Amino acid sequence: MKRSKNLSKKRKILISILSILIVSIISIGGYLFYVVNKSTETLYNKTYEPIESKKAEPEIIEATKPMNILLLGVDTGNEERPDKWEGNSDSMILVTINPKTKKTTLTSLERDIYMNFGDFNAKLNSAYARGQNKEAISTIEKLLNIKIDNYLMVNMEGLSDLVDKVGGIEVTNTFDFPISISDQETDNLNQIPPGTHKINGAQALVYSRMRYQDPEGDYGRQKRQREVITKIIQKVLSFDSLSHYQDIINSISNNMKTSIPLNINNSLALLGYKDSLNTITQEQLTGEDLMLNGISYQVVNGQHLLEIQNKIRKELELPELTELKTNAITVEALNTGIKNEEPDLENQPIQDNTPKPQKEIKQHENKQFNSELGYYE
């Protein structure tokens, strides 16, 4: 097996960009949603969807303790799907936000990670297709051995629409050739000439996706992605008209589902997480290539996974783990034939670092989690 080079597919890349951007907008949303509070009821009704199938009472965010948000990017490429939220979760990023250290950590999870689902094995991203956000969250909780506080789900339509809603952005093509992806997509003729130009949403997708012509490869592409995100945030913060914010809210509400109630009660609290974006670090759970029955998987190394688990736990201010517990099929498990011990997820009440509910949420009444030790026993 070879170590994966993390060659992200185009949908995963674009959804990742949109996911990070929406988290940024949420974190500065204390002001945005506050100044347009008349729109918050519509935004709440369109975007709020709790982790369980039936809605719980809205939660009040407290920006005093670390929290995490699972970002799910849904593949909406099949035009025959009647529901734009159907499909696999082709992008999965755990965002860990610590307002005390003013730090945000983005942990990307490979969609093809080889997982054990009890009676069968399959890819990580198939969990969403079987049980949508509830199944995806439960699966990733077992993978990382942590409690996930909230989720945020986006679809592919969002990034281009959002760039257009802010009136386009200005970027600089430092190459001596136009940035284009027409060699991969012959019907996509959008390009960005050398130099500084104002680009629209369709061009922003191209600018963020090009990799093969970049001498720095994926690293160069990531720099352009960060440039796009930064420019959009700068445009959002520069607006002095409520109509601009209204357009942005409409764009978000049409392309996002989240367990975080975006209402006026949470608006000022969300603002408390803004400074956590000052320092953003990125982690990647990678694997080794494995081909089984013509299907390609990524098999994670147990030590690498344990290191990722503990990096997340450090940002959540939880004790370090010395033993790996996971539902992933690791390299060691394949070599020895010994299945990994899974965390006990039958009981999982809200941890101290979750948003505080207005009243007891019944969906957790039969669940238990060792909040002192910070892991499942």
What function would you assign to each model-found segment?
Residues 79-83, 122-130, 145-150, 194, ...:
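Second-shell loop/turn segments in exported
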Residues 64-67, 87-92, 101-109, 119, ...:
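Extracytoplasmic
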Residues 60, 64, 164-243:
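Flexible, polar/acidic helix-loop-strand segments at domain edges
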Residues 127-190, 259:
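Amphipathic, coiled-coil-like alpha-helical scaffolding segments used for oligomerization/assembly
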Residues 2-101, 287:
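Entry/capping segment at the start of metal-dependent catalytic domains
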Residues 91, 121, 125, 133-141, ...:
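Extracytoplasmic/secreted envelope proteins and their assembly/folding machinery
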Residues 85-89, 118, 127-134, 153-157, ...:
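Soluble non-cytosolic domains of exported or imported proteins
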Residues 51-52, 56-57, 119, 257-377:
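C-terminal solvent-exposed extensions
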